[in-house]
């Protein structure tokens, strides 16, 4: 069960379960030590996330209010935004302190044509601002990944969501292998991977470890690993799931840090349910990025004012944490 900061790709699920279940202070202590080996503990990257096309997705993800299958969800569908508006919002996010701008479209897969051309222009515009650019567009083909890479895309987000074993209880319109194939396509064109999952959907601890096992077996590890806690939304199949206890998120962050020491661990959806102290504990446990802004796609997030108070409480953190690829 050694977790000494060495980059490994041979973790066993049982090893990861054992790490996750360590006494909390031991787990967080180990994770913080490993974090300091690979990262400046005073650097926390702020990322902003915008829904550039909202609702009407043909996938049936049980957690997602944007699925067309969940007709009782109160959600206004919006067509793809125009590039000028998106780049203007990126500039606003940059002025508020964000270094990374993430754009999400509720699609099953990328289609060639006017809309994809518009996304390419968005990526170019965000990069011209000196920001990292990330998109999540669903599945994509090699020639599309090539175009995104040529436009300067920093990272492509495509989450595994959960373990292979639990996956079929959450989504049936896309296979786990579909997700892995998309990740392989992205990486083959030199685009960074942003890939993580969601906890609190009814999965077991072993499911959580199994998902981390899949990620940690990738060579190299995903450059970015978002850890999300389910935000139950009325009208979705998971609407009645209880909100997870904050320390479950702390444990997941710490375990992710131990098995993927050099990756950026992003504290993502569900952060609005954490008090200031729980968020700080997540940062101590190895999270080194937060999503900044009032909403994450269509779910609530901690407000910018709250985050300003959070960082003030911590002290003078260096939040100017932009990768060299964004220069």
UniProtKB/Swiss-Prot annotation:
The pathway noted for it is: Cofactor biosynthesis; biotin biosynthesis; biotin from 7,8-diaminononanoate: step 2/2
Names of the cofactor(s): [4Fe-4S] cluster; [2Fe-2S] cluster
This enzyme's EC code(s):
2.8.1.6
Gene3D superfamilies found in the cross-reference section: Aldolase class I
Q: Where does [2Fe-2S] cluster bind?
A: 102, 134, 194, 266
Q: How is the cofactor bound?
A: Binds 1 [4Fe-4S] cluster. The cluster is coordinated with 3 cysteines and an exchangeable S-adenosyl-L-methionine.
Specify the protein name. Answer: Biotin synthase
- Give the organism the record lists: Rhizobium rhizogenes (strain K84 / ATCC BAA-868)
| Function summary | Catalyzes the conversion of dethiobiotin (DTB) to biotin by the insertion of a sulfur atom into dethiobiotin via a radical-based mechanism.
- Please state the span of the N-terminal signal peptide per the UniProt entry: none
Where along the chain is [4Fe-4S] cluster bound?
57, 61, 64
Q: Which PROSITE patterns match?
A: RADICAL_SAM
What interactions and quaternary structure are annotated? Homodimer.
